A protein has these predicted regions:
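Short, low-complexity disordered leader/linker segments with a strong preference
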Residues: 1-33, 56, 408, 412-418
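C-terminal capping/gating helix-and-loop segments adjacent to ligand/active sites or protein-protein/ligand interfaces
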Residues: 359-414, 418
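Mature extracytoplasmic/periplasmic domains
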Residues: 106, 273, 302, 306-383
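Hinge/lid segment of periplasmic solute-binding proteins
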Residues: 93-143, 284-286, 353, 365
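Glycine-centered hinge/linker elements that transmit conformational signals in sensory
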Residues: 214-246
Length: 418
């Protein structure tokens, strides 16, 4: 674990809510803030530099940072929060927000942070019972990321922002016809709850789990989706089960897109700089395929939240205000957590944004007009959508259970959560 120092204020934008935001730290009591986040190296390094800058400006504040990949992050944080040992500040995904807020594990953040330059709808995603408990860090859009270099060399029709699911599957078939035997076109999404969510939303059938906690996986649509991937697996368009099982999203070595096993995968705009950093200029972002409706949506990339058990709520709040509103911080962080939430900060950054950054900005612009309404998800269902669904899907991939039997298991498992 690394220990850094931290602090508050650089070139800041907006109007202060309280005078304490720019106070000198001279004579103030030393504070060490535990802070934790997930991501790749392209997020870790700028974040550590930002913490160093904060401490330089506020010498009384130092940091005890922890950072990791996404795998295992949520489980570890949940365990810490349950034992009242959560970090003072932690990165939180929207899918878990309602659970943390309903368990009174988050400190209220309604004052001390300048929010006037942030879209009201985006701020609403961090509210619970009309109170602000989490601060969005980036505008984000669902996406597909593909290897543009390889697709161009294959000479096939590339993905587009207006493509349908039929065109997506045909893209996979066309690509596989020109790929080597040990290379595949599409990732097998049989066990991917998020990918299926896009598919069902695009059919106009709503989210697989409703906001009020009801099972809503349409049987006909789900079997259509699962059987499509079974056919693609048989044709070698998606990898065999044993290769699919090795995939770890965002991992530099095990992500099947990174290691050139597949050409395309579901992703998020906020993740794109991580892909681009490993292979600059190779990847391209496009919208999720559509059905009768769009399949994609806009969402906050992630939140900063403060533990309800922190002894340093005021300093944690000051840091978050600085993180989202300070121009010097923005110069370091750029789009490592998605397109900046502050409209003022985004305009400040525009002249220095690189191609990978601008792809995120353009993706958000393209997704917005027909975006599906994003569902926070019902509280208490994260284990079902993150683990149970994945486990059942993997049994289908390995041929241990038929799609029809798998659907029955999904229904049975859901009764434990309804």
């Amino acid at each position: 674990m690394v220990t850094l120092s931290a602090c508050s204020s650089g070139k800041e934008t907006g109007t202060l809510i309280n005078d304490g935001l720019t106070d000198s730290s001279k004579g103030q009591k030393p504070v060490k803030l535990r802070i934790v986040w997930w991501g790749s190296q392209t997020r870790h390094e700028p974040t550590l530099k930002a913490l160093e800058l904060y401490t330089k400006k506020n010498p009384h504040v130092t940091f005890d940072p922890e950072f990791s990949g996404n795998d295992g992050y949520a489980d570890k944080l949940a365990t810490q929060a349950a034992s009242k040992n959560a970090p003072d500040i932690f990165q939180l995904d929207l899918k878990y927000f309602a659970e943390y807020a309903s368990r009174n594990q988050l400190a209220e953040l309604s004052t001390g942070i300048r929010l006037q330059n942030i879209d009201v709808a985006l701020l609403e995603t961090g509210k619970y019972r009309n109170k602000q408990y989490a601060i969005p860090l980036g505008n984000n859009a669902t996406a597909m990321v593909y290897n543009k270099n390889v697709v161009d060399k294959l000479g096939i029709k590339p993905p587009s922002n207006d493509w349908t699911w039929e065109e997506y599957f045909q893209f996979g078939i066309d690509a596989k016809a020109k790929l080597a035997d040990n290379k595949y076109a599409l990732l097998d999404s049989t066990s991917d709850y998020d990918m299926y969510t896009h598919y069902q939303l695009s059919k106009g059938q709503g989210a697989p789990i409703t906001d009020d906690g009801k099972f809503n996986i349409n049987k006909e649509t789900w079997l259509e989706f699962i059987n499509k991937y079974a056919a693609l697996r048989a044709k070698g368009v998606v990898p065999p089960a044993e290769i699919t099982a090795t995939d770890i999203e965002y991992d530099a070595k095990l992500d099947l897109l990174h290691n050139d096993k597949v050409l395309i995968r579901r992703s998020l705009g906020a993740i794109f700089t991580g892909y681009d950093s490993l292979k600059p200029g190779v990847y391209q972002l496009v919208k999720v395929p559509k059905g009768g409706q769009a399949g994609g949506f806009l969402k906050p990339s992630m939140f900063w939240a403060v533990s309800a058990d922190t002894k340093h709520a005021e300093e944690a709040t000051k840091f978050i205000d600085w993180f989202i509103n300070d121009e010097e911080a923005a110069d370091i962080l750029t789009t490592t957590r998605g397109v900046p939430v502050s409209s003022t900060i985004l305009e400040h950054l525009r002249p220095q944004l690189k191609n990978a950054d601008m792809q995120q900005v353009e993706l958000n612009k393209n997704v917005a007009p027909d975006a599906q309404k994003y569902s926070q998800g019902a509280k208490g269902w994260s284990n079902y959508t993150e683990k149970d669904y994945k486990d059942i899907g993997e049994q289908v991939i390995f041929g241990k259970i038929s799609p029809e039997a798998a659907y029955d298991v999904l229904i049975k498992k859901a009764k434990d959560y309804e």
